[in-house]
């Protein structure tokens, strides 16, 4: 019988001291701390504490790491309104013919019909309409800005790295550090942060050990970072995000002789979302995914997960709870806070090996 508290957002809250929110990343990348979740049959006291470099011991030859190769756009754009006031757009996703869905700040100052200019330029934009589903605005950019690849040139020149609001500083180094080392598909407005821990040295070491790497794409957007707005999780809906799971990835998973390990919640969402398009059987897929993963979900593909520590009452916390259970997750978070782990995007990591996953969550056939 499922615990009814698992389906209430208020059950996923926890107190976090402000000083535990990481403002800068670990250097080198693989030196971030890593909490290793104990097996499902063992108590919390069996948790181990190390660093991300320890993945060289935790992963075995034949294991398959699935990473998200999305690249973060410099999607935060300062614009001038016709009266001269300064506003900000967060450029989210293309809607065709140079039209882009954007979040506006302050939103009440930006209405349909308003003409904007990118600050410091003569490049004009027009607010076309409100988007009720996202709370954003549909904005007309130059028509050659039709997709992430074509708008990236403009954003690289005039945009800023869209760091999360809880990182209260600006540093030119973020242009490089807020990207994974394997990011090559532009389109995200937030980094798949678990992947930030993988240095070139760690990736090379894993390859030498015989750990394989497969690359999916999920362009991180509203579906990942938008706050959950309902306490009744049976009614939860998430904004869709664009996903590509290629035939090469499907083949790598089918021939995997070890364990399928997702790097980050976005890799989980991509793989499981693609599988749910085909009745739980993974096939190549390109398109939008809005899958909700929360306690009670039966995983089709993913066997283990490396992830960061997530915000209270977030959809990401629900996803991790689906793997190891809500009560255990919150107990682990309490332990991490007491041991001074660093939280959120630039913070430390958790390693959830397959033996730590709840039996009812394990993929069928593995």
UniProtKB/Swiss-Prot annotation:
What are the record keywords, sorted?
Cytoplasm, Queuosine biosynthesis, S-adenosyl-L-methionine, Transferase
Q: Where in the cell is it found?
A: Cytoplasm
Q: Name one GO cellular component term.
A: cytoplasm
Entry's EC annotation: 2.4.99.17
Kind of enzyme, top EC level?
transferase
Q: In which pathway does it act?
A: tRNA modification; tRNA-queuosine biosynthesis
Q: Which domain of life is it from?
A: Bacteria
Does this entry carry the keyword Methyltransferase?
Answer: no
Q: What is its main location?
A: cytoplasm
Instruction: Cite a single GO MF annotation.
Output: S-adenosylmethionine:tRNA ribosyltransferase-isomerase activity
Write out the GO biological process terms.
Answer: queuosine biosynthetic process; tRNA wobble guanine modification
Can you state which reaction this protein catalyses?
A: 7-aminomethyl-7-carbaguanosine(34) in tRNA + S-adenosyl-L-methionine = epoxyqueuosine(34) in tRNA + adenine + L-methionine + 2 H(+)
| Record keyword DNA-binding present | no
State the protein's purpose: Transfers and isomerizes the ribose moiety from AdoMet to the 7-aminomethyl group of 7-deazaguanine (preQ1-tRNA) to give epoxyqueuosine (oQ-tRNA).
Assembly information from the UniProt record:
Monomer.
- Membership in a protein family: Belongs to the QueA family.
The protein in question is named: S-adenosylmethionine:tRNA ribosyltransferase-isomerase
């Amino acid at each position: 019988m499922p615990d009814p508290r698992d389906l209430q957002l208020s059950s996923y809250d926890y107190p976090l001291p402000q000083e535990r929110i990481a403002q800068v990343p670990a250097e080198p990348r693989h030196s971030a701390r890593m909490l290793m979740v104990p097996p499902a049959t063992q108590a919390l006291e069996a948790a181990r504490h190390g660093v991300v470099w320890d993945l060289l011991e935790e992963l075995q030859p034949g294991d398959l790491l699935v990473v998200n190769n999305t690249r973060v756009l410099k999607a935060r754009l300062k614009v001038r309104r016709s009266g001269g006031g300064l506003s900000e757009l967060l450029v989210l996703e293309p809607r065709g013919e140079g039209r882009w869905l954007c979040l506006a700040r302050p939103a009440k100052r930006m209405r349909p019909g308003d003409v904007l200019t990118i600050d410091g330029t003569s490049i004009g934009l027009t607010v076309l309409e409100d988007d009720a589903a996202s709370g954003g605005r549909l904005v007309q950019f130059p028509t050659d800005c039709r997709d992430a690849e074509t708008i990236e040139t403009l954003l690289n020149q005039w945009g800023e790295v869209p760091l999360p609001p809880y990182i209260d500083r600006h540093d030119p180094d973020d242009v490089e550090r807020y990207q994974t080392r394997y990011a090559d598909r532009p389109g995200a407005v937030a980094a798949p942060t678990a992947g930030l821990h993988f240095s070139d040295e760690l990736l090379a070491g894993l390859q030498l050990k015989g750990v394989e790497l497969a690359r999916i794409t999920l362009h991180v957007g509203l579906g990942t970072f938008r706050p959950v707005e309902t306490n009744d999780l049976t009614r939860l809906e998430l904004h869709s995000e664009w996903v590509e799971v290629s035939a090469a990835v499907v083949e790598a998973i089918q021939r995997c002789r070890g364990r399928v390990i997702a790097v980050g919640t976005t890799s989980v969402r991509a793989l499981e979302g693609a599988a749910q398009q085909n009745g739980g059987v993974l096939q190549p897929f390109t398109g939008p995914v809005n899958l909700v993963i929360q306690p009670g979900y039966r995983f089709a593909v993913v066997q283990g997960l490396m992830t960061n520590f997530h915000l209270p009452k977030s959809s990401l916390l629900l996803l991790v709870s689906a793997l190891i259970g809500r009560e255990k997750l919150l107990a682990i978070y309490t332990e991490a806070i007491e041991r001074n782990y660093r939280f959120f995007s630039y913070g430390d990591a958790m390693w959830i090996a397959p033996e730590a996953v709840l039996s009812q969550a394990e993929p069928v056939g593995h």
